[in-house]
Regions:
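Soluble, acidic/polar mature domains that operate outside membranes
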Residues: 1-169
Length: 169
């Protein structure tokens, strides 16, 4: 903030709350906050196999007579080897994953269970890499672009792995 011209105004209650906060409460409450509309590809690595999903856009089809679809409205769908795949639940699973604790200062000590690389149409962050490593029987350590960030429930990682496996088989 030395060179910043922005003036930060905080009242005493906010300052005290910040000073008294436990470090864990300052960590993010999501594993990945992502605008999926910027994704140009999602690569999943399972058991040494790579699967590349790519988004495509089409005119939205009217589902029911009761639903009004705007003319020219588009929807995104995902392809794997030219075949459409329902990737929505996988994307939701990634963004809804909740950390169980911080992984600051930790290093992966077991094999990687899953690697997801998201290529993006974003010059500042053209690629985001999430790796999930078994940590304990209950936890997986998550790295974001190579840096350990949080611990997550291993059952959530297993469910994500299974969901991706169903899409690629």
């Amino acid at each position: 903030m030395n060179d910043s011209r922005v003036i930060y105004w905080m009242d005493a209650a906010d300052v005290n709350a910040l000073l008294e906060a436990e470090p864990e409460s300052l960590y993010p409450n999501e594993v990945l906050l992502m605008d999926w509309s910027t994704a140009t590809a999602l690569t999943a690595e399972l058991a040494e196999e790579r699967y590349v999903f790519t988004p495509a856009v089409r005119e939205k089809q009217q589902q029911e007579a009761a639903e009004e679809t705007q003319e020219g409205e588009q929807e995104t769908y995902w392809l794997l080897n030219g075949e459409e795949r329902e990737l929505g639940p996988v994307l939701e699973s990634i963004t809804s994953m909740v950390p169980r604790g911080s992984a600051a200062g930790m290093e992966p000590c077991h094999a990687r269970e899953l690697k997801i690389t998201i290529s993006r149409d974003n010059h500042r962050f053209p690629e985001v890499e999430l790796c999930f490593y078994r940590n304990t029987a209950e936890d997986c350590l998550v790295t974001l672009n190579g840096a350990p960030t949080v611990l997550v429930n291993r059952a959530d990682v297993s469910a994500l792995y299974e969901a991706i496996t169903k899409l690629v088989l």
